[in-house]
């Protein structure tokens, strides 16, 4: 079935209805919070948001107890991974009273182009891809730019390594060699047959990680393999499009035995970069960094200008053609106002 294209007025009307529904839900939650705070609440304590359900969240206390909590109306938007101050209620539902400062946050633009945090206090972003759906360097590079921009260490993860065969091995190897040459950590695993899963566990232990990647690459299957007994919905590739069907519906935080945490978030087909500038994109290509600022012209676009340090590095083989093509493709997809 063809995707329905909405007019601007239809999109505005849908957005307005959603905002009105959200406002009504927020008013109901505000009344619930007032009722709770008018009764008996426990002392303030710190906890971590491990799941978000719109107007309510699940919070885990220091002793491992999980409670559903209302949100005070004056709080900023909370996401999975946030550290908070909360008070337990005598009816089993508590109240979040404050958000603690974030060490890091991973953001992406929403449909209106406004930045929306999707995870907090993450120190490792695991970029998952697979032989099927076919991996594209441009999408991987977008995730790498987002990780570099957020100051979060990336880890490249090829899942479904058991699907590498004669038909795709050459292309997969060439893709992996690009990122190995750049020095990015990269692990090849299979959640299906257990290949290198112990190596992955070692890389995740002691970190707060988030898995990102297009749908169908097996993020939820990886969670099931890493944490047996965890109930996550797993989908397969669409038989019509060959793209992944979205399965996980809300970001959740899980604990690894070694002390690390995993935030499993909904799959997305393409990661937007509307929140970064041209300078941010350039800085996200790590092989560009020592060259930036050394072009003959200060406003060099690294296209055909004489004396361009990046073009000289491309000619000398210090920048790979695939990476330069990806850089140009990403810039071409950005609004001209960001240039």
From Swiss-Prot:
Domain of life where this protein originates: Bacteria
Keyword tRNA processing applies: no
Kindly list the places in or outside the cell where this protein is found, as annotated in its UniProt entry. Answer: Cytoplasm
Q: What CDD domains does this protein map onto?
A: YjeQ_EngC (cd01854)
The protein's UniProt keywords, in alphabetical order, are: Cytoplasm, GTP-binding, Hydrolase, Metal-binding, Nucleotide-binding, Ribosome biogenesis, RNA-binding, rRNA-binding, Zinc
Gene3D superfamilies according to UniProt: Nucleic acid-binding proteins, P-loop containing nucleotide triphosphate hydrolases, Probable gtpase engc, domain 3
**GO biological process terms, semicolon-separated:** ribosomal small subunit biogenesis
Q: Where does Zn(2+) bind?
A: 295, 300, 302, 308
Listed GO CC annotations: cytoplasm
Cofactor(s) recorded for this entry are: Zn(2+)
| Ranges where the CP-type G domain occurs | 111-271
Tell me, what is one Gene Ontology molecular-function annotation carried by this entry?
Answer: rRNA binding
Tell me which positions the record assigns to the signal sequence. none
Question: Under which main EC class is this enzyme filed?
Answer: hydrolase
The note on cofactor binding and number reads:
Binds 1 zinc ion per subunit.
Q: EC number(s)?
A: 3.6.1.-
A Pfam entry, by short name: RsgA_GTPase
The record's annotation in PROSITE patterns points to:
ENGC_GTPASE, G_CP
Binding positions (GTP): 159-162, 213-221
Say what the protein does.
One of several proteins that assist in the late maturation steps of the functional core of the 30S ribosomal subunit. Helps release RbfA from mature subunits. May play a role in the assembly of ribosomal proteins into the subunit. Circularly permuted GTPase that catalyzes slow GTP hydrolysis, GTPase activity is stimulated by the 30S ribosomal subunit.
This protein's assembly is summarised as: Monomer. Associates with 30S ribosomal subunit, binds 16S rRNA.
PANTHER family under this entry? SMALL RIBOSOMAL SUBUNIT BIOGENESIS GTPASE RSGA, SMALL RIBOSOMAL SUBUNIT BIOGENESIS GTPASE RSGA 1, MITOCHONDRIAL-RELATED
Q: Which family does it belong to?
A: Belongs to the TRAFAC class YlqF/YawG GTPase family. RsgA subfamily.
Q: What is this protein called?
A: Small ribosomal subunit biogenesis GTPase RsgA
Whose protein is this, by species? Answer: Pseudomonas aeruginosa (strain LESB58)
Which lineage is the organism of this entry classified under, starting from the top rank?
Answer: Bacteria, Pseudomonadati, Pseudomonadota, Gammaproteobacteria, Pseudomonadales
- The gene from which this protein is expressed is rsgA
